[in-house]
Amino acid sequence: MSDRISVVLAEDSLLVRDSVVRALSTDPDVTVVGVAEDYDAAVALVAERSPTIVVTDIRMPPTSTDEGIRLARWMRTAHPHIGVIVLSNYADPGYAAGLLERGTAGRGYLLKERVARFEELHDAVHQVADGGT
C-alpha cells in the first residue's frame, strides 16, 4: 500500500487505548494521528485531522452508552469518506446493525478481545480503509 492509513482512536479505557495504539504501531502502513477519551474530543479530532479511519469504543463518555455508534452516525453525515471500526465487548450483532448500513466509506465491528490479535486488527483496518466491511 503506497498511502499510509491515518487513524484516530476514540477509547476511554487506558488499557485498551494503549493496546490498540501498540497494535497499530506494528503495521508500517498505519499511523495513529490522534487519541480521544470521549465523544466530544473524538469529533474535534476527526474534524481537525481528517483521518482515513476512526477506531472507536462503542461506549464512552459523556453518557457511557452508545457514543461510538453516535460518532459513526455523525461521521456518516459529516465525513462519509472516513471509515469507522467500532470496538465492543458485546458479541450481540444488534449493536452493529446501525453501523453496517450503507453510507459510510468502510465500516467494521470488532470485539475488543480481538485487539490482542494484531493481525486481526491490521486486517480490519486495511479492509475498512479499502472501503470494505
Kindly give the residue locations of the regions a language model identified:
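C-terminal output helix
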Residues: G94-Y95, E113-A129, T133
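Short amphipathic alpha-helix used as the core "switch/output" element in two-component signaling
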Residues: A44, T65-H81, A97-R102
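Conserved acidic carboxylate
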Residues: E11
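Acidic, metal-coordinating helix/loop segments flanking the phosphotransfer/catalytic sites
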Residues: V35-I53
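Active-site residues of response regulator receiver
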Residues: D57, S88
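Two-component/phosphorelay signaling modules centered on CheY-like receiver
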Residues: L14-G34
